[in-house]
């Protein structure tokens, strides 16, 4: 239809207002299409993500093999070089997710940047220290922000598959340091790390020329890592069943819980966890509410824990179902709406 209408109009000389109008309309349509494509690249529908089933060196071991790893924003720390990344653009933080069957999870390891776990479903045992002797149990709605320079691990302690979302600090969260026995046990299954921290399956691949197997760290190095007792680590834990103590009114129908950092958009709040992670973590709570004209000056993502949240970003509209994520362009106009029968929760992470 456009071509049939366009041709005769353009036969007039000089060029008619009709042609100019059509050209302008086509330009606007093209811009809208390009904007739609750009925003689609910022939208991560959880059911469209491709997980890695062998994301780390201990992935063939009992207690670790029945799990999936998702890279949603940024590469995270997955050792699988083929891990699918949905939103690759840098945000100064990473977002991932882990699902695991009962009695499965990660081995003891340490990170050089912040690692914040948001429990979506299930019952999880978190344990820490080089021997993994200290532990706590967390449930859906709970959050734990693990300090750097400490060994930590987690295991699904429930009766069915569970899900955790994980926020990691920095564009490059660095490498993982494993306790020696993890690497030693993994090697017996054929899995190893090379000295560039790339993952190799020795049962099907040879060590590339110029590379060698990464050796476990020495006992003297282990002593340099921090140890925490449960009462020391509790200040880094938010229990969802205590949320009413920390709720702030964002407007008449949306409450906010500030977990990390002290800012949501341009408003300041006291955080539940006082820790320098490099990002703000806020939770919006509502069943029927809306908020308009938000504007974020730093890289920001939103991801739904529960409920269908309608998000309008300038002229782009989407619905975030549970587990879906959207990356917000800097200085865009953002409107949020929720219409459910029970309280729902929307997570928001913004660079500090």
Question: Could you tell me what each predicted segment is?
Answer:
Residues 138-158, 169, 313, 320-340:
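Conserved metal-binding segment of the jelly-roll/cupin
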Residues 78-82, 96-111, 280-297:
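Conserved short histidine dyad/triad with adjacent acidic residue
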Residues 110-140, 150, 294-322:
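A short beta-strand-loop-beta hairpin characteristic of the jelly-roll/cupin
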Residues 84-88, 106-111, 128, 135-137, ...:
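Short histidine-centered beta-strand/loop micro-motifs
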Residues 9-10, 18-19:
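Cysteine-centered motifs
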Residues 38-41, 151-232, 236-237, 333-352:
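Double-stranded beta-helix
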Residues 28-91, 194-285:
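A short, N-terminal "cap"/entry segment at the start of jelly-roll beta-barrel domains
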Residues 5-6, 26:
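Short hydrophobic targeting helices and cationic amphipathic motifs
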């Amino acid at each position: 239809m456009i071509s049939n209408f366009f041709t005769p109009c353009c036969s007039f000389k000089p060029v008619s207002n009709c042609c100019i109008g059509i050209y302008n309309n086509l330009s606007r349509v093209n811009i809208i299409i390009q904007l739609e494509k750009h925003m689609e690249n910022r939208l991560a529908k959880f059911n469209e993500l491709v997980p890695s089933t062998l994301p780390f060196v201990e992935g063939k071991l009992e207690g670790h093999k029945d799990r999936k790893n998702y890279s949603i924003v940024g590469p995270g720390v997955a050792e699988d070089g083929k891990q699918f990344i949905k939103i690759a653009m840098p945000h100064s933080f990473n977002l991932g997710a882990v699902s695991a069957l009962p009695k499965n999870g990660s081995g003891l390891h340490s990170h050089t940047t912040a690692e914040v776990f948001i429990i979506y479903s299930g019952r999880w045992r978190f344990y820490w220290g080089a021997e993994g002797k200290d532990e706590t149990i967390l449930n859906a709605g709970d959050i734990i922000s693990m300090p750097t320079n400490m060994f930590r691990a987690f295991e699904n302690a429930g009766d069915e598959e569970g899900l955790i979302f994980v926020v990691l600090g920095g564009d490059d969260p660095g490498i993982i340091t494993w306790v020696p026995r993890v690497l030693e046990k993994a090697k017996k299954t054929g899995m190893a790390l090379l000295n560039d921290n790339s993952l190799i399956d020795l049962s099907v691949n040879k060590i590339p020329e110029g590379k060698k197997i990464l050796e476990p760290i020495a006992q003297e190095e282990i002593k340099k890592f921090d140890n925490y007792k449960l009462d020391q680590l509790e200040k880094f834990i938010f229990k969802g069943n205590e949320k009413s103590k920390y709720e702030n009114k964002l407007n008449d129908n949306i409450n906010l819980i500030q977990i990390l950092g002290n800012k949501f958009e341009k408003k300041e709040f006291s955080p539940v966890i006082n820790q320098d992670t490099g990002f703000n973590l806020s939770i919006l709570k509502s069943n029927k509410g809306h908020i308009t004209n938000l504007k974020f000056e730093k890289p920001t993502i939103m991801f739904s824990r529960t409920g269908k949240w309608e998000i309008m970003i300038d002229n782009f509209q989407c619905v975030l179902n549970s587990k879906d994520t959207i990356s917000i362009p800097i200085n865009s106009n953002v409107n949020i709406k929720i219409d459910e029968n029970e309280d729902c929760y929307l997570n928001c992470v913004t660079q500090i």
